[in-house]
């Protein structure tokens, strides 16, 4: 989740005593560009030219003290307006489209003939000033409006009572990328990654565009469980799962559907009372027991790893260690039945292991260094887990790369970030700009696959060969709020062992625009994140005989 919050910056209304400068003919001749973001129309005007609605650069429009009896719906085309004054006109109604002008901070409707207001005004979640005095509005509306913080209360009331359109979402498309191998033995399984938006983060301060009833956990949890159950993934990685909800909702509901699970809360839970601990969020992994058997489970506390590897770095202690994000990992044994039929089975002594890792990195955009180091710490710990798992009796080989890895995460990092570069390219320069020129160099080598005393040639490397399941901009965004729309959730997999057969595509972006959905959650979308879902094809590292010959791994 990207906790940037609703815009509450100080708003300065236009100055009525402003002085304009008219360009001279010489300035015009010399090509000087004019800039005007405000427009005032006065003189007892009765109607407005349609060309006005093409001035989309306007931020302030003064239409007060005229004789306007109606405002056309096309006013909503002025999407950059933050100030609109319609006071002292002859308006008896307002267009519902006014509610689409979500940039508005000030809307003045004083001294008109308004008896009702369109409930769509409730969508103006950034509005700080609403002028309604001098209108014959109902007592219900005026009593709310005249309360302390009346503007906010009235807007919330209208948003909560606004009818929801459209009635349902269009289906997300399944994008097939490759057909399953029909010659070599392979196992196919699906993986979901989903940030479910923890209840304590789902506030009107952050998501003012969403009705309060649709932010309520009792409402949202139905949509979240519907999303999870509908796609029926073999492996499910969830972030922002509240501790109490894991034990009372997610685990019981998914156990009934043939899953087992593992969960760990953020590190802060350790120092909290039992009651407070219930509301700490964390990461969970679920897997279908008919397809996988749990071998090991692990929690990685980033603040503990940071403390153990600080090597005297103040930045490590003051910036990284203070964040209590965590990751979880499970080592699973893949059931032999998954490897298809009609082919020579894997040797009975071979056990195909799979590691699934899930993490949620720090949210703040100003802490790109922390996100990158948290990712390095997590991958380094996963490498340790793999090394231990690969040396277990019955495991195929001592090489950690022989055990395939699926890494799911809300990385809170865009595709062009150091975090994604590190995961995708096998490493990152130790002077990468995301480190912000802070002194991390010594301790970073603890997380490089070459080791503290190895030759790194100025790079921090991890040794895995990972690839994102969602490449080539298959998703335009995974997090969709008013403030921010971008890809920050990922599913990575070991490309030496696996192929992507397909992924769940995006919700139609045009549909979101056409229905004026400026951010999620929404009555039809229960989280501010969209789920990721991929179907992976796994080939065992040691392939069986085909016609008496060992076929090499094609990857």
From Swiss-Prot:
Record-level Gene Ontology MF annotations: metal ion binding; poly(A)-specific ribonuclease activity
Statement: the UniProt record of this protein carries the keyword Chloroplast: no
Main location: cytoplasm
Catalytic class of the enzyme: hydrolase
SUPFAM superfamilies: DNase I-like, L domain-like
PROSITE patterns with a match to the protein in the record: LRR (PS51450)
Region (Required for interaction with CNOT1, CNOT3 and CNOT7): 1-152
Record's protein name: CCR4-NOT transcription complex subunit 6-like
Biological classification of the source: Eukaryota, Metazoa, Chordata, Craniata, Vertebrata
Name of the coding gene: Cnot6l
């Amino acid at each position: 989740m990207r906790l940037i919050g609703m815009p509450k910056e100080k708003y300065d209304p236009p100055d009525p005593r402003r002085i304009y400068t008219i360009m001279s003919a010489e300035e015009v001749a010399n090509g000087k560009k004019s800039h005007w973001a405000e427009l005032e129309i006065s003189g007892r005007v009765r109607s407005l030219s349609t060309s006005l609605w093409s001035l989309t650069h306007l931020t302030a429009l003064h239409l007060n003290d005229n004789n306007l009896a109606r405002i056309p719906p096309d006013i909503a085309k002025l999407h950059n307006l933050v100030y609109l004054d319609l006071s002292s006109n002859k308006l008896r109604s307002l267009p519902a489209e006014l509610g689409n002008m979500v940039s508005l901070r000030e809307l003045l409707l004083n001294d008109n003939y308004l008896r009702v207001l369109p409930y769509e005004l409730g969508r103006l979640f950034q509005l700080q000033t609403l002028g309604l005095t001098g209108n014959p509005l109902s007592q219900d509306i005026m009593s709310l409006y005249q309360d302390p913080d009346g503007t906010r209360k009235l807007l919330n009331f209208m948003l909560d009572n606004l009818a929801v359109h459209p009635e349902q979402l269009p289906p997300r498309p399944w994008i097939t990328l490759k057909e399953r191998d029909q010659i070599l033995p392979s196992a196919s399984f699906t993986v979901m990654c989903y940030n479910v938006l923890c209840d304590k983060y789902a506030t009107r301060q952050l998501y003012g565009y969403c009705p309060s009833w649709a932010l309520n956990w009792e409402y949202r949890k139905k949509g979240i469980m519907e999303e999870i159950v509908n796609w029926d993934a073999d492996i499910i990685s969830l972030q922002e799962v509240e501790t109490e909800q894991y034990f009372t909702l997610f685990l019981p509901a998914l156990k009934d559907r043939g899953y087992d699970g593992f969960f760990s809360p953020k590190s802060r839970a350790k120092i909290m009372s039992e009651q407070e601990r219930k509301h700490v969020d964390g990461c969970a992994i679920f897997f279908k027991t008919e397809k996988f058997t749990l071998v090991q489970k692990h929690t990685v506390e980033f603040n503990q790893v940071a403390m153990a590897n600080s090597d005297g770095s103040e930045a490590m202690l003051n910036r990284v260690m203070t964040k209590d994000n965590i990751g979880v990992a499970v080592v699973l044994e893949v059931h032999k039945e998954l490897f298809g039929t009609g082919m020579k089975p894997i040797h009975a002594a071979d056990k195909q292991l799979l590691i699934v890792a899930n993490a949620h990195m720090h949210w703040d955009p100003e802490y790109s260094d922390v996100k990158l180091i948290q990712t390095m710490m997590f991958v380094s710990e996963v490498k340790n887990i793999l090394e231990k798992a690969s040396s277990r009796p019955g495991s195929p080989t001592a090489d950690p790369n022989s055990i395939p890895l699926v890494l799911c995460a809300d990385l809170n990092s865009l595709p062009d970030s150091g975090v994604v570069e590190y995961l995708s390219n096998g490493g990152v320069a130790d002077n990468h700009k995301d480190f912000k020129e802070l002194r991390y160099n010594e301790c970073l080598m603890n997380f490089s696959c070459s080791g503290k005393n190895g030759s790194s040639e100025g790079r921090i490397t991890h040794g895995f060969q990972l690839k994102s399941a969602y490449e080539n901009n298959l998703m335009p965004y995974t997090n969709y709020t008013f403030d921010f729309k971008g890809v920050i959730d990922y599913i990575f997999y070991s490309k030496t062992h696996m192929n992507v057969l397909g992924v769940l595509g995006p919700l139609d972006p045009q549909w979101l625009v056409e229905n004026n959905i400026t951010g999620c959650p929404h009555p039809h979308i229960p989280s501010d994140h969209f789920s990721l879902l991929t179907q992976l094809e796994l080939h065992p590292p040691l392939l069986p005989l085909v016609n008496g010959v060992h076929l090499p791994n094609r990857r």
